[in-house]
């Protein structure tokens, strides 16, 4: 990449426009197969992009690359992709949980914004965790350490799924449409709104799909795409 693609970009831009095409360039170490061997067509271990995109999914591939320390070789294959896909499914399941029960109860996040004085301890905890993640994400991305951000995101996703939602399910399931139930919905909506905007640079397709169904369906004044939204504030 450095000798060919990046150099070609630099040479052509300098010659044709008199300026560099980029201010900062981030490269990574080698991509090898999941056993650490170089990929060769003759060895039968090469994975072509179109095949990987079809079988793994593009966002799964992007998650794999983003999670990798750029100073180390990436071990690329369908086995590691399956592990990442499980995490992506967890994110989707969090969204699906909210979407399913909010639809059943007719919850409108625009008409029922967060009432901060009515939040439970768990609500306050997950909101604090969310905004801490936003702050750390901003710090890591400024330093081009996407891998550090993704490691934090994976830990956060585990807490959101296995702690907040699992220990709050009865609040969503109960028949009474009271303020406690509305607070749970409003909190989860707030959390999802922030995390999909935060993760959009890494997972552009999944985040866009969630955004259109979650945010645009609720707020007609929201930007047309998640990729037109500002990065969330901590």
Where are these regions (language model features)?
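Metal-dependent nuclease catalytic cores in nucleic-acid-processing enzymes
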Residues: 2-18
């Amino acid at each position: 990449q450095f000798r060919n693609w990046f150099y070609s970009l630099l040479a052509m831009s300098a010659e044709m426009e008199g300026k560099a095409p980029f201010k900062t360039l981030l490269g990574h170490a080698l991509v090898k197969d999941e056993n650490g061997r170089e990929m060769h067509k003759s060895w039968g271990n090469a994975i072509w992009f179109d095949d990987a995109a079809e079988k793994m999914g593009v966002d799964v591939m992007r998650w794999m690359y983003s999670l990798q320390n750029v100073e180390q070789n990436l071990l690329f294959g369908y086995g590691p992709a399956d592990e990442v896909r499980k995490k992506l499914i967890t994110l989707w399941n969090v969204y699906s949980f909210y979407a399913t029960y909010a639809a059943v109860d007719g919850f409108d996040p625009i008409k029922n914004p967060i009432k901060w004085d009515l939040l439970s301890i768990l609500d306050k905890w997950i909101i604090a965790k969310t905004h801490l993640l936003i702050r750390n994400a901003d710090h890591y991305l400024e330093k081009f350490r996407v891998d550090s951000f993704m490691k934090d995101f994976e830990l956060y996703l585990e807490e959101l799924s296995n702690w907040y939602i699992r220990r709050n399910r009865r609040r969503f399931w109960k028949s009474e449409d009271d303020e406690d139930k509305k607070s749970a919905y409003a909190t989860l909506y707030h959390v999802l709104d922030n995390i999909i905007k935060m993760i959009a640079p890494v997972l552009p397709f999944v985040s866009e799909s969630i955004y259109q169904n979650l945010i645009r369906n609720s707020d007609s004044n929201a930007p047309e795409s998640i990729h037109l939204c500002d990065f969330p504030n901590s």
